[in-house]
């Protein structure tokens, strides 16, 4: 069972894609969706606005959940399938400036997502203990399975960063999740989404 920080999180996570139970052999990477021109430092400034229901200003595939200095007054959603190398209990850690929320699914879909870590305001880069809810409770993850992971990040002004780390079997202290454990979820990239039929001339 995933621990839920629903009272601390925005609790308005919307799906970037439907996801599939059997992810097959997805491509490595993380989908980064960016919305620009949004003031405020709270995640709710992004998720509670109508703009979050519209197409992102920009969509990229990045190699990791470790980014910095993308600009001011923007919001971001990062989507990936997480696959651990060894079965066991893992903790996930979140660091960001400004605020962020870390959500994890029970499988490769977004059907049962839980908010497992948060940053309110900001934390120092790669500091996993500035705030009490930056680290998740231990979560049992099985090798070979995919788990849908989402980070919602909101930046107002000044320096900005967002990172996700893990600890677990043979990983005694937090390290940035390696790119070898992150994969692009099917259906998230714009070219993967169904397009309306072209109108006849």
Predicted regions and their residues:
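Bacterial N-terminal signal peptides
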Residues: 2-12
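Acidic/polar, compositionally biased interaction segments
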Residues: 17-201
């Amino acid at each position: 069972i995933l621990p839920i920080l629903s009272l601390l999180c925005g609790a308005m996570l919307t799906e970037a894609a439907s996801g599939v139970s059997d992810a097959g052999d997805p491509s490595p990477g993380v989908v980064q969706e960016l919305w620009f021109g949004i003031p405020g430092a709270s995640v709710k400034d992004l998720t509670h606005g109508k703009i979050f229901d519209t197409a992102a200003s920009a969509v990229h595939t990045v190699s990791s959940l470790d980014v910095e200095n993308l600009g001011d007054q923007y919001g971001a959603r990062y989507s990936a399938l997480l696959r651990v190398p060894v079965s066991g209990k893992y903790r996930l850690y979140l660091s960001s400036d400004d605020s962020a929320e870390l959500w994890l699914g029970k499988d490769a879909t977004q059907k049962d997502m839980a908010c497992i870590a948060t940053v309110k305001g900001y934390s120092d880069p790669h500091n996993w203990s500035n705030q009490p809810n930056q680290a998740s409770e231990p979560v049992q993850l099985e090798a070979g399975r995919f788990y849908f992971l989402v980070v919602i990040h909101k930046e107002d002004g000044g320096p900005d960063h967002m990172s996700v780390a893990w600890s677990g079997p043979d990983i005694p202290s937090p390290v940035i999740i390696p790119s070898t454990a992150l994969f692009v979820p099917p259906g998230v990239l714009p070219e993967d989404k169904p397009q309306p039929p072209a109108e006849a001339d």
